[in-house]
Amino acid sequence: MLNAIIVDDEEFARSSLYFLLQENCENIHISGIAKSVSEARNLLAHNAIDLIFLDIAMPGENGFDLIPQIQSTKTHVIFTTAYDQYALKAIKANALDYLLKPIDIDELKEA
């Protein structure tokens, strides 16, 4: 079982992804949900997290700002974004994968 967190500033995106994961990915346990990078840092500091579903474009710090903290761990990142121009940057940041919003269930299962 993988312990995962969802990080996204949009309530609808967070709840939609949570629902998709709960209904379709029985090997993933959602250990927390954050609406900002600072909340994600707090979750990472207090939980053993295997996987992060991380939005890129958020107010304040963006998803890429969290990467330096994650790189020193074995935590994998799947970026979620509505902007396909971030795909190359996500790959260069050693993301496990990236998903374009709205998230397609088949793409989620492949990631």
Features from the language model and the residues they span:
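CheY-like receiver
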Residues: R41-A111
